[in-house]
């Protein structure tokens, strides 16, 4: 989401329970945090541009979300990609199933454009800078782990000129 253009959209899982442990680090090191995106796991980005998004598309997301049980996640480990420090959501199976359902419905849209594998590794970004320079951040976050969360909805975010905004929320099956 770092090179996003106005009108870009994404489908994300919000994880507010991790904010006390990582919020200050995200504000400092995650380029999307200051733009209004809270702690999250990305399901699909980029998705249909806002100007082409239809009610039928949103109905499709609502259908997928409505068939999805709430997802119980535990964040107990920190992972690293080149230039990314992240929390590992476990179990990842329900997230991967959600990614599969969304990409099956919209096969022209792969997570991250297919750049990081299909499907990519589910993760919650803490910092998008060289992780090897973040020893103090890692030590601080490790003290707060594990963190548990129940995710009960999928959120549609849209890139505006001033940052990201929430367009809709699609509740999971209750």
Labelled PLM ranges:
Residues 78:
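Conserved TIR/SEFIR loop-to-helix hotspot centered on a Trp-containing motif
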Residues 152-161:
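Short beta-strand segments and strand-loop junctions that repeat across beta-rich extracellular domains
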Residues 1-72, 92-152, 165-174:
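Basic, often amphipathic N-terminal segments
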Residues 86-90:
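Short histidine-centered catalytic/ligand-binding loop motif
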Residues 81-83:
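Short acidic/glycine-enriched loop/turn segments that link adjacent beta-strands
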